[in-house]
Amino acid sequence: MKTTLVSTPLAQLETELLAVFATDTAPAADMANGTQASPQVQLLTRDAALDAAVKTILASGDFKAEANETLLIHAPQGMAARRLLLVGAGKQARFTVHALRKAAGSAVRAARAKNIREATLAIPQSQGLDVTATARALGHGAAVADFDPDFYRSDRKDKSLQSLTLALPEATDANAAEAGLREGIALGESQNLTRTLVNEPGNRLTPTLLGEQAKKMCAEQGLRCQVYSSEKLHELKMGSFWSVTQGSDEPPALIVMEYTPEGAAEGPVLGLVGKGITFDSGGLSLKPADSMEKMKYDMAGAAAMIGAMRAIALLKPRIKVISVICSAENMPSGKAQKPGDVQISMIGKSIEVLNTDAEGRLVLADGLAYAKQLGATHLIDAATLTGAVMVALGGVNAGVFCNDEEAWQHFEAALGQSGEKFWRLPLDEEYREMLRSPIADIKNVGGRYGGASTAAMFLKEFVGDTPWVHLDIAGTAWMDEAKPWMSSGPSGIAMPSIVEWVRSFAR
């Protein structure tokens, strides 16, 4: 996608589509009295020609500026643009940069639906946001919207946006806007890389091929990358990781990516660890057939780390980052591990495997330990780990666990930047009692209840005192229904927040 900044007056701006954002300034509904004020639409761009072009439409009440609402006007009077798109950003009182990001995505999705390949977004004036944050939100939202998962349709039509222009208001700092746009595009395209990887079926993205994708990205972005297989797992005594892969004919991949900027010799080293199960049948604890095809998404945590490392390479925070991905297939066979087996992890802790479908924690246990061995002083992992987090939080919030308040404060700050929805869940010591094994140091499942917390508590055993954040994205990594600003399918969840977590340490 080609990106451009212009300061041409809107009336003179020649473009296939000009998108202008608006909010509703009417007070919120009074629930006690059952009253609802009529919408009062306010354009976020002040321009006399624009006001004249939309006066009749706004007076009609056909456009209410509801969040992500769009209304297309052909040949707007008095303007050079071929089409004018009004895009709602919701209530003015609740307007945020994240509402603007989604509105930008809604504008691009509306353009794609009409096979429009070139669009201009008018940067809102003021709204309490600096121009860098505004341009970044527009770029990020536009890039994420410019994606569809129908890669393998023989009749697939390329609807991707070829050109995106931001129209600057008068007296706008063009350099600041350009920096924001560049950041937003970097984040959005990296999130789309994550989504592309998650979308790949298991026969087209084995652990070996995932390693090749990581190496390709790292070569393009100037990152170090090493991909190891079975021999390295045995050398490192990663018995927990190996136990998952032994049932498959596909070899595992231990992927290590490194970002080392100049001037980062001292200070924290951040470790990003991803679960990369490219297909999860459940192993001998076989999953039900219903929806098993979605288990190609069980490497969404690994994909988030690959996307995050790309964005980190582009945004260049001054802090060292190491990423470890543990990738395998979890398959049943005569070689597969059996319920009741005892495995020895990299740190020597013995694990009684009661359920082979609780495999994500087995690969992450060794991945977290290895990231520490490589020098990570702070850890974050992402995994489609438990169905329990889906029961607890549905598809709205992802789960987050943390063993350190300072690391948590960094992640809270990251969420303020990314706008993603995570909900902190408990790590009380009582959950550890549910993992006691009569024959080993720990068992890999804790019973029917509290499954997201017992899974997190299992992982906590392998991080020790290292500050650590655990993201359980099982309920949010895949969307069955499209949003106005984003297609259905892989969401790319966690990647933006991981990047912002890293950047929070560098500020």
Swiss-Prot record:
- Sequence positions that bind Mn(2+) 1: 280, 357, 359
* GO BP, sorted A to Z: proteolysis
The note on the cofactor says:
Binds 2 manganese ions per subunit.
Q: Which domain of life is it from?
A: Bacteria
- Which CDD domains would you find in this protein's record? Peptidase_M17
Active site residues according to the UniProt entry: 287, 361
Which reactions is this enzyme annotated as catalysing?
Answer: Release of an N-terminal amino acid, Xaa-|-Yaa-, in which Xaa is preferably Leu, but may be other amino acids including Pro although not Arg or Lys, and Yaa may be Pro. Amino acid amides and methyl esters are also readily hydrolyzed, but rates on arylamides are exceedingly low; Release of an N-terminal amino acid, preferentially leucine, but not glutamic or aspartic acids
Q: Which GO terms describe its cellular component?
A: cytoplasm
GO molecular function term, any single one? metalloaminopeptidase activity
Q: Where is the signal peptide?
A: none
Annotated Mn(2+) 2 binding sites:
275, 280, 298, 359
Localization of this protein: Cytoplasm
Per its UniProt record, the required cofactor names are: Mn(2+)
Question: What keyword terms does UniProt attach to this protein?
Answer: Aminopeptidase, Cytoplasm, Hydrolase, Manganese, Metal-binding, Protease
Please state the Enzyme Commission number of this protein: 3.4.11.1, 3.4.11.10
A family per Pfam? Peptidase_M17
Q: Does the keyword Metal-binding apply?
A: yes
What family does the Swiss-Prot or TrEMBL record give for this protein?
Belongs to the peptidase M17 family.
Name the PANTHER family for this protein. Answer: CYTOSOL AMINOPEPTIDASE, LEUCINE AMINOPEPTIDASE-RELATED
Matching entries from NCBIfam families are given as:
PRK00913.1-2, PRK00913.1-4, PRK00913.3-5
What does the record give as the function of this protein? Presumably involved in the processing and regular turnover of intracellular proteins. Catalyzes the removal of unsubstituted N-terminal amino acids from various peptides.
Entry protein name: Probable cytosol aminopeptidase
- Give the encoding gene's name: pepA
